[in-house]
Amino acid sequence: MVRFGSAASSDNRRRRCWSWYWGGLLLLWAVAETRADLHYATVYWLEAEKSFQVKDLLDKNGDAYGYYNDTVQSTGWGILEIKAGYGSQLVSNEILMYAAGFLEGYLTASRMSDHVANLYHQMIKNVITEQKVKDFMQKQDEWTRQQIKNNKDDPFWRNAGYIIAQLDGLYMGNLEWAKRQKRTPLTKFEISFLNALGDLLDLIPALSPESRNNGFLSMSEISKMYEWDMGHCSALIKVLPGYENIYFAHSSWFTYAATLRIYKHLDFRIIDPQTKTGRASFSSYPGLLASLDDFYILGSGLIMLQTTNSVFNISLLQQVVPESLFAWERVRIANMMADSGKTWAQTFKKQNSGTYNNQYMILDTKKIKLRRSIEDGTLYIIEQVPNLVEYSDQTTILRKGYWPSYNIPFHKVIYNMSGYREYVQKYGLDFSYEMAPRAKIFRRDQGKVIDIESMKRIMRYNNYKKDPYTKHNPCNTICCRQDLYYMTPVPAGCYDSKVADINMAAKFTAYAINGPPVEKGLPIFSWVHFNETTHQGLPESYNFDFVTMKPVL
């Protein structure tokens, strides 16, 4: 039931306004680069009217309040920060989440439109594919909403309901912005498309006639998407020899058309005994309620990183059905409900869609005592294929110094089911877990990581002209530059890095950089050479530095 909280006394109100005044000054100092970049807004739930209202100001009495700092052109990143459920009235969790989504949609609608323009035709090539995707996603959405309605006492589905409420609010916020600006809003499907971007990497092949074949993708077929199109990434967790510190980092690989970035700090005060946290700081994109990369610092003390595993055995994709939850939805549910790597895995494995088949790394900072011990359960590795989620505690490996991730499954059952064993036999050791180029480079260079700066360097590493392990391929390295490949240059590859340590994580702080690597004399990427690729709202070239990401509200 939605109800208002008790009225504050005039003294309390004065104190609140005074603290808000100083907090507002601090916020302006901390986040504003130019006033034109910065947009504050607050969403209110109007109980009597059963409707939402948004105002262009920061009011901590509102049901959701925050800002978007649009500094993509100057730093490579926009910054979105939203707090919800901390206002003067008590609202239901669903109202709270809807308000948070509404605010995000309202603040970032223009960038959401840019992101759709840049990626829609990269992902959906023709009207036949478009209709198949629309039909599948409509069935999946209807099934999800019915499950939420039918299972109100089930904590899993209750938390799923919070996320769908946020998604609905996102659409309505985009609608409100479009109405005020006299612009065409994004459709519900376009917003669903944005959130399902990762899942579409497997869903689109699953809906193609080729998936009905009981075989494997050939090298010529996979070469069209290999390295970047399947969302490949690099990740590393590094433990110093005396447990003095633990660093974690992630570098995303995808089309450079996806470099419209937003780093998000979200803090939702969800009151539910089965919701462990509503707080997260993560790298993301316009209109996405999840990270996609993935790189999360969670209020539960968990860190989540992810890299994608290809499914070469396309017969597995026959098991993809709409009666399931997409990976982005299950990630959000697990992030909210879990307080350990094991409970994260157990939550995530439910209602497996078999899309966006990844390796997830869950680092539990609560189990780490620097300079003393790393307890069992500190690192869980979770991997998915259609109809199976495998997970295990791999803290023993982490204690030896590092955990690398480079788009090859760790668990033998996932590795074999996905077709990697056959690929090694046909195409060589580049597809093996132990002897892949990035496995060798991480093994050789991880010992050089001694501080945050050296962690940044390894995650931006690309010395393909001289490194013997790359074989002169600009993508056989930690941070790929497919645009430099002499045979078929494509504007794609490694386009960001996020780096932090566990002390920074306690403050929801990280360093992030947007753009392909320029280390070792590599040229700065510019769209001048790839103008045929839609890049609406993106910087013309990328030579940014690392930015410190830290919540200020």
Swiss-Prot record:
Keyword Metal-binding: no
Gene3D superfamilies referenced in this protein's UniProt entry, alphabetically: 3.60.60.20, Phospholipase B-like, domain 1 (2.10.70.60), Phospholipase B-like, domain 2 (1.10.439.20)
Single GO BP term: killing of cells of another organism
Any one of the GO CC terms: extracellular region
Residues bearing carbohydrate: 69, 313, 416, 531
Organs and tissues of expression: Expressed by the venom gland.
Keyword Protein biosynthesis in record: no
First-level EC class: hydrolase
Signal peptide: 1-35
Subcellular location: Secreted
Keywords assigned: Cytolysis, Glycoprotein, Hemolysis, Hydrolase, Lipid degradation, Lipid metabolism, Secreted, Signal, Toxin
Source taxon at top rank: Eukaryota
EC number: 3.1.1.-
Alphabetized GO MF terms: phospholipase activity; toxin activity
Family indicated by similarity: Belongs to the phospholipase B-like family.
Note: Only two tryptic peptides have been identified.
Annotated function: May cause hemolysis.
Record-given protein name: Phospholipase-B 81
